[in-house]
Amino acid sequence: ISFPVMQTKDNQFYLNHTVSKEYNDRGSIFLDANANGQFQDDNSIIYGHSVEGGGMFTLLKNYCDEDFFKSHPVFYLLTPDVNYKCHVFTFAKTTEDSVFYTTSFGDY
């Protein structure tokens, strides 16, 4: 997956707009509006469509296959300031009302 990650104050905008802000049903990949933008939150949620033909997040479905999961344990998130090496430790299909969408956690 090699797309820019957009962000705006309205999570609905990039659901159907391109990086150049033109209307498009496929939209863009974007960071949750409540995130700080530097990927330093406890949980940074990135949204994107799974589209026909393998674009955007469609390839993430491959993580449902255990062999693929084991053979692709790392991905890189590149930002203008920092390049992150990320380790995949779990994969789950979920719905928009799932607990996985929690972005703020209390002190424990």
Question: Which functions belong to the PLM regions below?
Answer:
Residues 1-108:
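Solvent-exposed, non-transmembrane regions of membrane-associated and secreted proteins
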